[in-house]
Amino acid sequence: MAIRDSLIQVTDLKKHYNHGAIKALDGVTVDINRGDVMVVIGPSGSGKSTFLRSLNLLEQPTGGSIVFDGVDITKKKVRNADGKMVKLNIDHHRQKMGMVFQHFNLFPHMTIMDNMTLAPIQVKHMNKAEAEEKALALLDRVGLKDRAGAYPIQLSGGQKQRIAIV
């Protein structure tokens, strides 16, 4: 039997609104291993988006735990490599976790290249040349390298979706 490599462990996850009157999530438990493909399906209002947004703490869960790559990201403090308790840096974990929103937006006044390099330059403090090199490599992977100078209005819906994914 193969050993599973757990990436995300969700245990008894809850998200309640109106002081518990509305239970968007009520005891969700799931283990997602590296390489797994997971589909979340259900009718409108069943908590799919709330669950996904909770995985990277865009929604703060009411209860339960989310362990991502061995770290319980629902805790305010975690143990660092030296064994000291330090404040959790959720941005560090978000850099390893990608999400494509149902309704994604690209800045219409910016080229695809500018859209793709904005976050690496502003958030990761990457220099422009390095950010552009990485963006071109990603665009090449999804077959859109030749569209780097285009504006979002010049792309099809599917092309915009691929840009949002990379």
PLM feature segments, named:
Residues I3-V166:
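ABC family nucleotide-binding domain
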